[in-house]
Amino acid sequence: AAIELVCFIFYPALFSTAFAGIKSIFQALAAHQPITWNSFLDVTGVLLVITILFGRHFCGYACAFGSLGDAMYELTLFIRQKIFHKKGRHGYPEKVVRVLQKVKYILLAFLLLSILTGWYANLQGMSPWDVFSMLTAGKLPNASYKIGIALLILILIGMCTQERFFCQFLCPMGAVFAMMPILPTALFHRNREKCPAKCGLCKKRCPAHLEIDGDTSLSGECICCHACQAICPKQNIHTGDA
């Protein structure tokens, strides 16, 4: 929580800066110009290398939008438990999560295609991320951003209904990170022989409904929040070969 707070306060634009690097590549391709390295790509490159070496820890701890999602979900959870006396953590069924996780790839493809075709300029004022960046910079978006404001509000509502709603379902950078080849030493493992019978707490607690040592095609969906490690009664979940 402390790391998330520090990054939210001091580095709220990391997400948008990283995507600006991706965007600059496709803008150069659209203009039939050589791709030139820039400060945006510095951030993009560093985050991609970190993801390959250590997994999606940026998503888990350093993304301001992800931290906002955590805050919205935990606030909703507190209200449910303290006021409405609801037990347990709420969220979508696994089958629904699996379907919605694909939306971010569709959104990424749409954004990149719109850049390549020159249609991206028509999206001016519609980006909820631009609105969020303005707010974290202490600026109020004007009326031209009304669609972006409305979309941000809808995302905030979604954050209340599912843990890591934006990260899992809508984040275009999350889609990029999820497609990166993550080193095996950065993946979570467990010794199944040490697991209590019919436990399954790690998968139940995972926002993405992932099973440790399960379907490796889904390993990119892990946002490295370490919730599985925290809830394991046997401290049986680890990264690397230990």
Regions found by a protein language model. Name each.
Residues 1-213, 220, 226-242:
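Non-ligating segments of multi-cofactor redox enzymes
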